[in-house]
């Protein structure tokens, strides 16, 4: 299988919960462990397949060996004397939350907050943060921090309830009054667990109405309103133009509260980048027309155009692009260099770029490298992320960041080859701070070892055949005679060109209907082109 033979995987293959429909076929395809097991149905399926000869003992033994190797490796690495340091574990959780939070918006320098400013924290998530997923991903944490406990002296108002969506007038009015009396209002908002969890899909990108209503009401009386988000994925923000700052925490783990305060007050400089695009509305998403499918069939009509590959290729207006993330400092990109301008099969090219911290505080920048392919037969995204590196810089400091590209960096999966393929041509190497903020671009010429095999049929169009040198040599003169004949029939020379353009879209087998070629002649031409 590609998993083991091509990619070199040596571990165990485990199914998703309840994903097996035919245990014997699964083993033959490389499955090892079925989850959940124990009902006996899988065992009976295996025994029946062995007896019927549709599953070999060799295939079954391979799955058993993979399981035993895994058990053996776990046993060898067990450490009975290991001590779980809960404090160290929590400190790590805080650090992860601090480094992954994304500053989406920060107008007028509202953030970081000045120490001692009169701030108010609003929203139930300030006291009870949504910090982890639901369902089987849920864990029992030893320690969870909330923002309030790490911001002593800061006023608080609940503002909304997470167990319902309707506005609570008393809670909202108290929050709005507190916001109007403060210098800065920080609203902790997002999605309750009931909005997104294991086992079901989200049907909306909207937050609960009571939260959206609260943000709008607070922003109307407090120009310095900051929104801190707790959510598992992208959301709509109908209020985004009314607030100067938005900090995306996502589901930030045990240290969510402490990390939020450190980021808000500048003890830590935000450095996270979006790993997804935030569309403006649900109807903008690539799967909108085909989700959730019909009956038992899901149609993946978007193909490879998922996420930023879709939004950037269609130049869609998005809320926040893939890779976006601000900082309390600024970064300058310069001196993009490629170690070679032409690369062939088996060769690599090193791409280097210099990044400088041009601001007044230390910060981290995630440098992103995108590759834009030449136009070819296959529809490909306008650009794809092929590398990224996070670099830490003091004020005024510069560092050189290096990436290595090879054939795989330029390739796409070609169904006809059952493998990845990079077509010859000029590729753009783009470096920047997001998929929409590309600072520098270089050119790389790629020379494939072999052209992509092309197979023409009677259903191929004249335009397609004309892209092949042998096809153009044979079909070209035929096209010219047909166009000239059409021009002679009308008596207008200009009709030659228009007739030629029209004919490019017809199929080869139409030439038989036009009495231009016989079926035998067409088959001979196809054989000659395909064997060239």
Regions found by a protein language model. Give the residues of each.
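C-terminal non-catalytic regions of proteins with extracellular/luminal or membrane-system context
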Residues: 1, 5-8, 14-23, 43-55, ...
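Structural preference for beta-strand elements that scaffold enzyme active sites
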Residues: 10-12, 32-33
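A short alpha/beta connector and helix-capping loop motif
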Residues: 24-37
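Long, well-ordered, tryptophan-enriched scaffold segments
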Residues: 30, 40, 46-78
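Helix-enriched interaction subdomains in cytosolic or periplasmic regions
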Residues: 58, 69-102
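Short, conserved alpha-helical segments within structured domains
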Residues: 63, 85, 115-117
